[in-house]
Structure formats: C-alpha cells, structure tokens
C-alpha cells in the first residue's frame, strides 16, 4: 500500500523542480532507473530478454 501511495505522489507535479525524482513506470522502484526508457534495470532486463524493447540485444564480444 505504501508503494502505491509513493507512486501516486511521484506522478504529481512538485512545488519545486528539485523535488522531482524518477521512478520505474512498471514497478515503482526508485533506484537504478534508466531515464531513456523510464524503467528500472530489472524491468529493462526482463523486457529485453522477452524482445519487447526494439533495438536492444544482449552484448557479446
């Protein structure tokens, strides 16, 4: 329940711009969020493995 409240709080426009912070749009995780995709590293990895993010593939060299 607390996580849902924090997600809703993060969606609101803050009074001061410095108070804004990124959260994962899928799970609400506040840390390790990739700004370009607006999702956390864990969700990014899962979606990349499923092939749901175009242009992303596992690196190998």
From Swiss-Prot:
Binds 1 zinc ion per subunit. Zn(2+) binds at residues 24, 27, 40, 43. InterPro entries: Ribosomal_uS14, Ribosomal_uS14_bact, Ribosomal_uS14_sf. Pfam families: Ribosomal_S14 (PF00253). Its cofactor is Zn(2+). GO terms for molecular function: rRNA binding; structural constituent of ribosome; zinc ion binding. GO terms for biological process: translation. Gene3D superfamilies: 30s Ribosomal Protein S14, Chain N. SUPFAM superfamilies: Glucocorticoid receptor-like (DNA-binding domain). It comes from the Bacteria. One of its GO terms (cellular component) is small ribosomal subunit. Part of the 30S ribosomal subunit. Contacts proteins S3 and S10. NCBIfam families: PRK08061.1 (NF005974). Binds 16S rRNA, required for the assembly of 30S particles and may also be responsible for determining the conformation of the 16S rRNA at the A site. Belongs to the universal ribosomal protein uS14 family. Zinc-binding uS14 subfamily. HAMAP family: Ribosomal_uS14_2_B. This is Small ribosomal subunit protein uS14. It comes from Mycoplasmopsis synoviae (strain 53). The gene is rpsZ.
């Amino acid at each position: 329940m607390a996580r849902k409240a924090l997600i809703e709080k993060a969606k609101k426009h803050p009074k001061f711009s410095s108070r804004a912070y990124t959260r994962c749009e899928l799970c609400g995780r506040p840390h390790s969020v990739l700004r370009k995709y607006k999702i956390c590293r864990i969700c990014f990895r899962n979606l990349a493995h499923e092939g749901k993010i175009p242009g992303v593939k596992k690196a190998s060299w």
